[in-house]
Each structure stands twice: as C-alpha cells, then as structure tokens.
Regions:
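Short, extreme N-terminal segment that most often corresponds to the first beta-strand
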Residues: 1-39, 148-149
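Intrinsically disordered, low-complexity segments enriched in small/polar residues
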Residues: 3, 46, 57-58, 136-137, ...
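Ampiphathic alpha-helical segments that act as solvent-exposed interaction surfaces
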Residues: 10, 14-24, 86-111
C-alpha cells in the first residue's frame, strides 16, 4: 500500500516549470482522463514516484489542526503528487519529498498546500506566509532547516 503526499500550487503554471524543480527527468504521459501529466519514477534515488498534473476549478479539503475542515478552491492549479511505499517512507521517501517540496516553494511564489493521503493538511502558504498544520503527526524540528521556517 502506498502513501500519497500532494503539493498543490494555485495558478496556471506550465507543468515543465514545476517539473524543473520537482523532477527534472520527468517524462510526459497522460492521466486516465487524457490530461497532460509529467511523471518520474525516483524510487531508487529518492524513495518515491512523482506525478505532476494541472487543472482548473479545483476543490480541496482536508483535516486542519483540531479536526476542523479546511477547504480551498483554486481557479487553476498544479498538483505534484508523491507516492511512496511504506517500507521506504521514513528513511528515504519522506525526507526527500520534504526537501523537494521546500525547493518548489522556494522557486515558486504561488499559494500552496501540502496534504497527506488527501485528508490531512500539513502545510499551507497564503500570500507568502507558510504555516504548518497537524505537526504532531509528521513534523520534526530538523525540518525547520529544510523549510527555512
């Protein structure tokens, strides 16, 4: 069973620009519905597979701190989805994924959100301010140096 982390950036952003930050060797494929997707299998190097897709009229919801429902509806968006096996999650996948998320956030200025399995809110960035959420379940103080928080 895989664990999915998804970073969503608000805006009409070319997928290639995000791929330069997330997975420079990503190859173009298509989604099940025929949309564009850039994908890279980085299991050996980083412990995950990454897919980059875009869309319009997005709707996202997840559990915020304290169990409240967080909702977001970006007009246009790009999703960077990281899929990792549970056996590589802690030693390889999660640290590399968080470093990649930090690199994307440093290289892009758009509002953003990071979720776990589509239902737990981890990070949001609104108007340039990044906020951590549900830190008991995932955050370690060592990550402060990755995110420069």
């Amino acid at each position: 069973m895989a664990v999915e982390y998804r970073l969503t950036l608000a805006g009409d952003i070319p997928l290639e620009q995000v791929a330069e930050l997330a997975a420079p060797g990503a190859v173009e494929t298509s989604t099940a519905s025929g949309g564009r997707m850039l994908s890279a299998d980085l299991n050996d190097e980083h412990g995950y597979v990454v897919d980059i897709t875009g869309g319009r009229h997005g709707y996202y919801s997840a559990e915020d701190d304290g169990g409240a429902l967080w909702q977001w509806e970006p007009e246009a968006y790009v999703d960077v989805s990281f899929y990792m096996r549970k056996d590589t999650l802690f030693d390889k996948g999660k640290p590399h994924m968080l470093a990649t998320v930090a690199r994307i956030l440093a290289g892009r200025a758009e509002d953003a959100a990071l979720t776990l399995n589509g239902d737990v809110l981890m990070l949001t960035r609104t108007a340039g301010t990044t906020q951590k959420h549900n830190t008991d379940g995932w955050y370690d103080e060592d990550y402060d140096r990755i995110f420069h928080l």
